[in-house]
Amino acid sequence: SERPKRVFNIYWNVPTFMCHQYGLYFDEVTNFNIKHNSKDDFQGDKISIFYDPGEFPALLPLKEGNYKIRNGGVPQEGNITIHLQRFIENLDKTYPNRNFNGIGVIDFERWRPIFRQNWGNMMIHKKFSIDLVRNEHPFWDKKMIELEASKRFEKYARLFMEETLKLAKKTRKQADWGYYGYPYCFNMSPNNLVPDCDATAMLENDKMSWLFNNQNVLLPSVYIRHELTPDQRVGLVQGRVKEAVRISNNLKHSPKVLSYWWYVYQDDTNTFLTETDVKKTFQEIAINGGDGIIIWGSSSDVNSLSKCKRLREYLLTVLGPITVNVTETVN
């Protein structure tokens, strides 16, 4: 099915309100065809991101490899009632407007609902889940234990993510909701230095229609790394946008695809993207069927006067003019 033709929108999701204390304002953002929360609020009318909201079960790292168990530590041990209650409290406190009709982003990155995908600093949730089953069934073989752990984890991970999304939609009906980063692609990773997504991940994305069916917007992340060649940077964006568009095309309601994009290199956060990298990555998002871009920034990008000045200068001279060009060309 062909996706509906939509206006290509670019959003400002940068905590530039932190620059107000230095007498620096970012009122020009809107001049560049960028949707900008009124008063430069970080949680605002156009876009609101909620970091680790509620009380998702998680193992929170402490020093020396220890961790704190939050709400059972893993989804199959968690109390969903407590989580959902806290989730609504968080939303009401952070952005109380129940008529919110912008983009609502749930940013939860402690674990992923596909058991296999919990590697790196998420691996701890896998290990914890396996240990739980092993303690219960000490005589089972390794494979059986892992299978059971995976089954339990995925069942309840789905429950937590799905119910959270449904509740967000129920209490903020007019907003477009989605989880940051999904669908994942795992392209341009050390083991997969190609534009195409990891084949297994694509199959797993197909199994996650329960999530994407409930999202009005898909929010793949296309932050790029300096260590990649310029062509690889473009390839990273291409693969991730294509996969999100593929998922959207397979859904009846064809959710919008808005790519999360950061103006610095992920592995070199003191360096702004070159003009060429900005142009090429923006074009790549548009060419591959994306419906827009969310320009993201970290609080540590704007925590001093000099950083605020640099970002403002970059917006006025590099980023702004390119966003105008891209939005006008595409629309």
From Swiss-Prot:
The keyword Oxidoreductase does not apply. It comes from the Eukaryota. The active site is at E109 (proton donor). Keywords: Allergen, Disulfide bond, Glycoprotein, Glycosidase, Hydrolase, Secreted. Glycans are attached at N79, N325. Coiled coil: none annotated. GO terms for biological process: carbohydrate metabolic process; defense response; hyaluronan catabolic process. This is Hyaluronidase. It comes from Dolichovespula maculata (Bald-faced hornet). The lineage of its organism: Eukaryota, Metazoa, Ecdysozoa, Arthropoda, Hexapoda.
